[in-house]
Swiss-Prot record:
Residues 11-101, 141-230 form the EH domain. InterPro entries: EF-hand-dom_pair (IPR011992), EF_Hand_1_Ca_BS (IPR018247), EF_hand_dom (IPR002048), EH_dom (IPR000261), End3 (IPR025604). PROSITE patterns: EF_HAND_1, EF_HAND_2, EH. GO terms for biological process: actin filament organization; endocytosis; endosomal transport. Belongs to the END3 family. GO terms for molecular function: actin binding; calcium ion binding. This is Actin cytoskeleton-regulatory complex protein END3. Keywords: Actin-binding, Calcium, Cell membrane, Coiled coil, Cytoplasm, Cytoskeleton, Endocytosis, Endosome, Membrane, Metal-binding, Repeat. It comes from Yarrowia lipolytica (strain CLIB 122 / E 150). Component of the PAN1 actin cytoskeleton-regulatory complex. It holds the Pfam family End3.
Amino acid sequence: MSAQGKLEEWEINKYWDIFSGLKPVNNVLTGDQVSPVLKNSNLSEDKLAKIWDLADVDSDGCLDFEEFCITMRLIFDLLNNNINDVPSTLPQWLVPQSKAHLIEANKAISQPHSKLDDSDDEDLENLGLSTDFDWYISPADRDSYSAIFTANCDRHGRVSYDALTELYQTLSRVPEGDIAMAWNLVNPKSDERIEKEQCLVFLHMLNYREKGVRIPRGVPASLRATFEKATPEFSINSSQAELKPQKSNAPASKKEAFANGYLQKLGIGGNSYSTSGTDFSATKDTDWEEVRLKRELTDLENLVEKAERAAADSKQHGNSYSTSHTALIKRELEQLLDYKEEQLRKAKSGAPASVGETNLKESEEEVNLLEMQVNELEVHQQRKQQELDQLEAELASLRK
């Protein structure tokens, strides 16, 4: 008999024999594959459905080996009268370590959701939360977020949800449910640990929530694709597809830096934080700045060329929305190109540049954002062309 409150090694080996015997595909079993095993238990359909819901932790409609172990243990506990009924929640001892963070996050998200009909809407209004969330991460914020990440990441450059527990405790205006919600947004694959870019966006959400801005309901398609490491599916009509840097209305001097006390506790300091590595952007007495700016100019010129081609295609196919949006992006690219050309002129003439002008990270972010916009436009144009081709084909068939 299985020990109550523990999965024995022999038990796991037995479940593995059953699991592998069902011939999993991509290390998971579908409902059809598991169905014979479930029905052989002679448990009621209602109980089997509850067991499935508990075991399918990531809600993907399939069971991996860990989830299969949960299923089998619950079935055997019922058959052996170790438990009288299917538990309403998964027992803590039965939660796989790799999925513990997902269980907690799902609890945190489902809990406030169940209260929306009662008082959560009122509570949110009383809190006076704003919806003015800005995805753009300023260089100063990026430095702070990077410091937190570096202090807590493992040797593989990844950080777990629990590793930031001390940080969460310093956030007086961020409830636990919102922390879990932000974590789920940057971690669509429900990994136990996340990488640096995911962590920076996660901290950015917490920063805004601490300042009284609600956690967004979703992430832009370009970010989501990065987090999933998959080919992006952009929707240019979505308001979330825009990733433009915006200036906050509140003066920076009147805002306390995010996690300032936590950074000081780490021995880094909040507002005074600076990277200890070599800052090449401060090298003004060499040819480095000129070389860097020339490279940026080349990248921007290529982006402008891509935007012009997309605009020409849109005009040719008569898509007024795409044409206007392309023109807008083209203007933004040209303005940034003019700005970079002015930087290069100053560098050649020896004129001093401001710290912001020589910040390589900021320039790279701007170029990346513009590249995202151009890519979105190209994908959108392709879709519109497909729609046009389909309509023309339908019209042709009607004329016959």
